[in-house]
């Protein structure tokens, strides 16, 4: 008995704890099986994973809240329309906002300058710090300023209140762009910067200069073409008029052939042209016809003051001066056809004064005259018989019988 009691006294406190734990676990171990231990370990691992995921979810929520202001302050990477859109949509800025309809932006210029434009880096939004430069940027991107009309009432109290409101509203500026509207950020793609005149490419300016030069040359060619057509039309009209008056235009060969046959001197009332000029019939008729008709007064024949007239035909008279020939017809109400050609026959009579001229009493006073050989155009009436008949102008002559 003494030996047993000594063994019980030698038991340490640790042994007592292990014995107590074994006594407490013994009921549980009695009801557990080997497969239940595996299930228990899986449950413990799952609970540990849930706790670890919960701790991880709480920490990113704090980091996201810290990083959002950094994204909002990153205005340097945005263009002007998107910067403007962002500050209008933000509640942080009080100097700029939408109007009631959301179609215009309202800017308090004084407050806008202090709140946004005068901010320093790294919080600067726009590159400029002047309100005029900012308004110029708005105009370049298609924003237009809208004037607000204030209606005043006749009552004093309401008038004063409206006056205060108008003074406040006068500080506000309204700007409109059809592609800048509240709730339509997709329209910002259409808000583009306008290209100024100074930034135009030199290729376009060279193209415009070449186009103007070509247009000027084309216009000059058209004017020359029109003048040529007008000259041809005038020649055709004169030629048709001469045909209607039975006055054919005489060529150089026919004139020289007729002059070689015979010559009769007559007097002419217009001065001779310069010897150096040689003009064709079609070119000289249009310019000299009116001057010759104004200068000619009368034409007298050398033989007994009579005029020659063909019966039923027109007789063309060729008069020669010192250097040129003139085809003159006294018929058709004083119409004279004129052809100027170089002279091939020497002058029969030189230039004579009025006092020395024969039959000077037959000439009007102050009318110079000169001797010119005259030949009837036989080609115009080859078979006609000429007859001397008194002219109706002889009735007014003092020597008329």
UniProtKB/Swiss-Prot annotation:
**Molecular function as annotated in GO:** DNA-binding transcription factor activity, RNA polymerase II-specific; sequence-specific double-stranded DNA binding
- Keyword list, A-Z: Cytoplasm, DNA-binding, Nucleus, Transcription, Transcription regulation
Subcellular location(s): the record lists: Nucleus; Cytoplasm
Q: Which GO terms describe its cellular component?
A: chromatin; cytosol; nucleoplasm
The record's section on InterPro entries has:
HSF_DNA-bd, WH-like_DNA-bd_sf, WH_DNA-bd_sf
Indicate the residues that the entry says bind DNA: 76-194
**Main localization category:** nucleus
Where in the body, by tissue, does this protein show up? Testis-specific. Present in Sertoli cells and spermatogenic cells (at protein level).
| Region of interest: Disordered | 1-30
Q: Which Pfam families match?
A: HSF_DNA-bind
Which Gene3D superfamilies does the annotation name? Answer: Winged helix-like DNA-binding domain superfamily/Winged helix DNA-binding domain
Q: Where is the composition biased (Polar residues)?
A: 1-11
Which family is it part of? Answer: Belongs to the HSF family.
What is the name of this protein? Heat shock transcription factor, Y-linked
**Organism name:** Homo sapiens
Provide the gene name from the record.
HSFY1
